[in-house]
Amino acid sequence: MISFDSAVSRFTSLIFVIVFSLSELSASTNIILLVTDDQRWDATGFMQQRMPSLGRTARFPWMEGNTPNLDRLSLEGIHFDNGYGVYSLCSPARATMLTGQYPHKHGITNNQTDFPSDVVTYANLLQAAGYTTGYFGKWHMGTQDERPGFDYVRTFYGQGKYFGTVFNDENGNPVGANA
């Protein structure tokens, strides 16, 4: 059985290999990591179409054709079939996605702790490989203005709200119609 530290070490090494191998790709290669909040793994038209090939019955057949942009991105890009959250709380899960580390390593174990600016994110590695990076949407890790590793930012503090959300840029300045 692989030890916990060995598994984390292997995962982190894999991330570094993937990111640094990206420098060999052409300048026109785009990387878009799209993450939705509280969405089932099979709640897109793309996955409903794939269900029979997975030996499963489509649970939401009405979804087919209702998520055309997500479906196209899935068909034209890489789709990870076995991605799992390691923490069922927004901020720790998001920090884990950004770093490849478990919450006890990166230090975010609740929704109020600011993201440590000295922790390396995949965005830092992409910047080192010559990529321009951006983060758009819910940050929800404390209230700090800094978004380590991202050149362009449009986020809001905390959980956000349904109407009148004020977005902030990479310097923490309000932007947009509700600024």
What are these regions (language model features)?
Residues 25-179:
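Formylglycine-dependent sulfatase
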